[in-house]
Structures are given as structure tokens and as C-alpha cells.
């Protein structure tokens, strides 16, 4: 592993720029660009006076060449466009009405969106095309692109469907539908595939939506335990334990970070595939599905863990019946009076989620990670550090291969 130093506060964001470069940003307002192979800090981008609240990258063709761009937003109510090749700040917007919480690039329309207390649509040259104002303290916290020029945006307990209407060079944005099926704040909003997207709330509600007609296709209310008492503190604790902090999908499965646990759902079968109620010692903050039935997670406990879906040889740990309700919870309505169930309900396709790797290196909560596949894995943390993790065996094989290739080239000469 390689420890990268350069930040002076919590590092919250990692964004891939290309096959070799990535950007990091956080509460110190700095944006640093790194080479994943060497660990070198290539550029230091200084502009924002307060913490970074959102960051994204995109590529575009100018002339015949491909170019990369980086957009950053800060709680100082500014937006900046950067050239990651030169480190120059190409554009800067400083008269925003509120801080931007999320960014979304629409490559097909050649525009990008910023979400906060208002939804703004910008062209590539940072010119404001249109905006819609919302008088909400929560504002827009997440956005996903939908077919036919629609956008889904999470606003507190609601998902608002916006339509982008194009007329010549003019763009107009308008709210078309308010989806108010969640009972608590939406923490995660992701695209699953061209036809589906998903949302997860603070009290464990996972809803899968149709991307075209915005109807509910599946509903999971994750309830593995009833509140142990009637006090407000105990109820609040249980809500935190089942809060969906993050979700990711490969189009076929969804992995949800629920409290300190992990839950994997089969989208087509509309059923749970595997789960770990205590996957970490504290809240899971970020997840990622990999190939071959593997997934990764990182947590406030400072660890990054690698998991594998395996066939279930023995009955899994018991769970409340409420967890397995597809269209609502069912089963217990009050406190459990008898001993806990010891037999797992018969669920077709249920598998176990087995720990196969544990990366320990950070002294603070791991906020997120970024995979460069064989080149390595990058993590960032509240300890102000980044770490590049590499597969030692794979790196040895790659070095050996490079040596053999060099020998062959020399022999040909």
C-alpha cells in the first residue's frame, strides 16, 4: 500500500479522470490530482475557501481530440470548472443562492446540472441555461438521469421528476411529478439500468422505480429488529441502524449499506440474495459491486472489506419476517413474546455473504473508495489521508511480464 499526504482535513470525494488519474477533495477546500500508478500528486487546485460539497468529471471531444474536465462545488457557494491537464481554472461562478449538494453531467445533451435549493442547468461553457427554485431547507441531495430527457431528484422525503424541454438552443426545466412514497429522508438515489432506478431512506425503505412511468416495481422495508423499548432514544437508535446510507448496482443486483450491515437484492427476481446484519463495527459509508459475485464496502470503523457471494451450505442467521416483505412489511406488529426464530425462512436463491479480505490502514472513517482494477484501489478518510492499495501477487506478475517483454524486445534487436 502507498499512503498519500496532501490534504489538511477530511477527504470525502474521489473522482476518476482517466485510466491513470484521479482527483481528491474534502473539507480543506483543496482539489488534488494524483497518478494512481506512481502515487505522485500532479496538480494542486486552489480556489474554494470552504469545504467541497460535490465533484464530478467528464470527457468531451474538441476538434479531434478527447479532453477531460473537472467540476467542483463548495459550501462557499461557488462552482469551478478545471482543466486537469494544466490545472487552470477555466470558469468560476460565485453568485449562487445556495450551496450545491450534487452534480450531474448529461453527455447526450451536452449540459450539466447542479442541485441545491435550486436546480440549475448549465452548458459546457458554464453559461446558465435555466433554473427552478425550491423553497426547501433540505434542497436537492442527489440526481439521476432518466430516459427521454427526464431527471429524478431527491428532495427530503420526495423524489421530484423534472423534464428538460429543448427548443432550438433554449432549454427549459419543469417539475412533472412528485413521488411521495417514502416516509423519511432519502439518503441514496441511484440508476440501476436503462429501465429502473432505486432510492433508499433513513428508516430502511428501498424502492425500485420504473424509469419511464415512475411506478413502484418493488418495495423493501428493511426491519430486522423491533424497537426494544418505547423511549425516543431507543427508537432513534433503531432508525440509525437501518438507515440506507449508500447503494450501488451493476444492473442486475443492488447492494445497500444499511446501518453497519450489507444487503444484496436481485433486481429481476425482486428478492434478497444475501445479507450481513453486522458487516462492519460501525456504519457502512460506501459500497461497490465487482465481477464474479464479489463486492466491497468501507465504514466508519476505518476498514475496507471484500466480500464474496457463496452458496449457502447451512441455515443463515435468523431475521425478522419484515425484512423479506417485497411490497411492505408483514408479520409481527408488536413486541416479540416468544423466543427468536432459529430457522431461516425458505427463500429461493438465498446465498451467504462471506468475508474474504480486510484492508486496515486508516485511523479514521473511510469515506469512499475508487477502483482502478488491476492498477489498484484508492481510499480516502477522515484521517486526512489517501491510500493506494495494490494486489501484491498481481503486481509481481505484471513486473515479471514487463521484464520478459523487455528481454524479448532486446533479443529481436
How would you name each of these model-derived features?
Residues 4-5, 45-46, 93-95, 132-135, ...:
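Surface loop/turn motifs at the tips and blade-to-blade linkers of beta-strand repeat domains
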Residues 8-15, 50-62, 98-105, 137-144, ...:
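Canonical WD40 repeat/beta-propeller blade segments in eukaryotic WD-repeat proteins
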Residues 9, 28-32, 50-53, 76-80, ...:
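Short coil/turn segments within WD40 beta-propeller repeats
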Residues 19-20, 60, 67-68, 108-110, ...:
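Short coil/turn segments that connect the beta-strands within blades of beta-propeller domains
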Residues 22-26, 70-74, 111-115, 151-154, ...:
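Conserved beta-strand element within WD40/beta-propeller blades
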Residues 36-38, 84-87, 124-127, 165-167, ...:
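Short loop/turn segments that connect beta-strands within beta-propeller blades
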Residues 64, 88-93, 97-172, 184-187, ...:
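Solenoidal tandem-repeat scaffolds enriched in leucines and small polar residues
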Residues 99, 118, 128, 139, ...:
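Terminal intrinsically disordered, low-complexity extensions flanking WD-repeat/beta-propeller proteins
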